Amino acid sequence: MTVGTRITRSIALSGLLFGVLLAFGWQRHPPTRAIAWALIGALIWGILQAAVILVGFGRSSGKRLHRVWRWGMVLTISTAFLLYLTLTSDSILPLRHFLSDSKAIRHTLSCGIHALLFGAMAIALLFVVWRKSDPFSPRLSGAVSGLAGGLVGSVALEMVCPHLEAWHLWIGHGLTLVMLVAFGWYAGRRWLAP
């Protein structure tokens, strides 16, 4: 399979999962804020997700400069997502108040589990498409897969989640992205090395 075919399949599969999660979420929780802004946000994060796949997998991964560029992309986009969550939150409860609210904890765990499930499905699909394709830096390719999968799960879920408290967003959405990047890095050696 050529690199172009793999990139096309990766973007199509990730985009499909992203769209499915948005559709299910908006069906259950129709956005009360301006729907145009939500759609613009979804489009921007979708384009960013496609760029992650294109930049992360589109060139030879054996060159040192390319590895530095890819790690920079993983860290920059993860940080940008956490900043985005901070900016979109409408309140920050003291941590002890957040932890004592059982409804908030249940909702945070529910969002985190859904983000992990959809993100893990995206990573699994990317691992199948890119299986045994990176002899030089399979862990880095795994981290890129984790970032792309995390964008599917965490970003799409964040756009349909009605809960905008900062701790909820950081734990239920941001931490799941970080966990999926770490999982991709760990599993990349087994799945992506020839």
Q: Where does each model-flagged region fall?
A:
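Select subsegments of transmembrane alpha-helices in polytopic membrane proteins
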Residues: 6-15, 113-114, 142-147
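Extracellular/periplasmic helix-loop-helix junctions in multi-pass membrane proteins
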Residues: 158-173
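Alpha-helical membrane-inserting segments
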Residues: 20-24, 52, 56, 121, ...
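Hydrophobic alpha-helical membrane segments
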Residues: 140-157
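Membrane-helix interface "capping/anchor" motifs
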Residues: 58-67, 131-140, 189-194
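Membrane-proximal helix-loop-helix units in multi-pass membrane proteins
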Residues: 83-139
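Selected alpha-helical membrane-embedding segments in polytopic membrane proteins
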Residues: 4-106
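Alpha-helical transmembrane segments of polytopic membrane proteins
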Residues: 36-48, 106-118, 169-178
